[in-house]
């Protein structure tokens, strides 16, 4: 399983800019429709759809390629075939069939998109291997907050596309949208930061100290308060569990 990164996205708007659309909920639905499902879940495929060619109906059990290296081996066979102009040696009918299905599709995908398989494509274009997971959405009068998890990293490619969409709203007369993304890895104190979009301007902060990383972790993953951490007289955060080696009997934290 991956390390999960918790992402908290808050989208705010100025009511006067959008009041011609309707009430607060109607405005939120207007803003969010291009990247949320009808169930109000953040959907990466609405912003950057996975090409149909990555959904080919392959069955690894019917080929000689191990599933863990399926597309890579088939791609290599087909690449050798294209490069040499002849069939690789010692290839039986079953492997030959796989080469011209999985291998050819992987080769064509790489030539077109720079990624042979869905995993590489998602990492390249989304910035993470899976769509948003464990999503929750909270709506208020002038903003919406969506919290969701991603594998290994915050989805940088998705944020870039989202900001382009907000730029387009700005250009057609809908200013006043602000979007803030705070993220924190489940690995305490690491891989944390904040991205802010405001009226076409983007700022990115990657927390540079362990203490800042813990502060972000507490904010994003614990709702701003967690007994597992404490702040010293200089304002730096510390992790009880780390300092006491996981010995709960000695640790003063009430968690």
Walk through the language-model features, giving the residues of each:
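Intrinsic low-complexity, intrinsically disordered or marginally ordered coil/linker segments
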Residues: 1-255
